């Protein structure tokens, strides 16, 4: 059975520079190698002396073959934002979007996930951490593809979300920025979706094993794949889904402390948890101020250098 493929939007611009260290082929069988440049001209793609509506380049069936893209922006809107040359496996597709060109990587889901867990966290992390990340990332991705295939779109109703018992935003404008904004590819390559940097960041045997060992595994709730959006650090508290993303309530994504109370912990969990402290009412200014200015116990509040080196 052929492995499912997805499309990942990598970069956009008036010009896109790319290269093929080894030969790629176009749909008509033309072999292409070396440095290339595609330019936007009057709603067309200008490449190799001709105009096109769309370009696609397929790799030869050789293990390890890749293409390179110049000036890929990583860390968009973060203090460490920068451009770099990145390498990708799979096919390269170039389309016209508005008055720019967009480079899209066509890649298998499992190869995509190997890159994601190597880009989002250290590829040298322990196997169990990488396996957990693989399951979460696969769940988020497949849930997103399922939603789009069913042509489901959330109707955003800010007033309804503001009426959540955990929200005081009754008179403020609420706006969600979601991955559904992408119309010509499945996901983007930055933190807006999941960080994906192709094979630029070296994967490791344990990253490959983590994806392989969990192949097909996803998080489920009442027979449906979970929308498993994740963050690297939660500040000790998890917000309700509808207050951050779409005006949809998910019972499995609720506001609570990033902590297991001792009374509910297993024997092994009790060894890593402190006193059973519940999440305070952060809608109260005094409680929120105390929470922000102190360092409350939380899973992501750790000084363990071994753990910190892996995430």
Language-model-detected regions and their locations in the chain:
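Conserved, single-site charged/polar hotspot
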Residues: 1-311
């Amino acid at each position: 059975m052929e492995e499912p493929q997805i499309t990942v939007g990598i970069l956009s611009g008036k010009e896109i520079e790319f290269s093929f260290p080894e030969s790629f082929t176009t749909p008509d069988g033309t072999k292409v190698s070396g440095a290339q440049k595609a330019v936007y001209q009057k709603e067309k793609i200008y490449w190799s002396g001709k105009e096109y509506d769309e370009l696609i380049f397929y790799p030869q069936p050789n293990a390890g073959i890749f293409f390179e893209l110049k000036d890929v922006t990583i860390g968009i809107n973060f203090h460490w934002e920068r451009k770099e040359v990145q390498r990708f496996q799979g096919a390269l597709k170039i389309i016209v979007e508005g008055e720019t060109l967009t480079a899209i990587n066509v890649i298998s889901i499992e190869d995509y996930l190997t890159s994601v867990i190597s880009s989002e966290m250290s590829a040298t992390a322990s196997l169990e951490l990488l396996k957990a990340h693989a399951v979460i990332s696969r769940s988020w991705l497949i849930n997103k593809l399922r939603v789009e295939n069913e042509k489901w779109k959330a109707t955003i109703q800010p007033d309804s979300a503001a009426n959540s018992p955990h929200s005081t935003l009754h008179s403020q404008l609420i706006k969600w920025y979601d991955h559904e904004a992408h119309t010509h590819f499945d996901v983007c390559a930055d933190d807006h979706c999941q960080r994906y940097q192709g094979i630029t960041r070296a994967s490791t045997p344990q990253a490959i094993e983590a994806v392989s060992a969990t192949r097909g595994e996803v998080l489920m709730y009442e027979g449906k794949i979970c929308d498993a959006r994740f963050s690297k650090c939660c500040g000790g508290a998890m917000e309700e889904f509808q207050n951050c993303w779409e005006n949809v309530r998910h019972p499995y994504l609720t506001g609570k402390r990033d902590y297991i109370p001792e009374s509910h912990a297993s024997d092994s969990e009790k060894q890593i948890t402190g006193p059973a402290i519940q999440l305070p009412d952060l809608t109260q200014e005094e409680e929120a101020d105390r929470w922000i200015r102190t360092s409350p116990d939380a899973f992501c509040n750790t000084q363990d250098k071994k753990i910190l080196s892996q995430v």
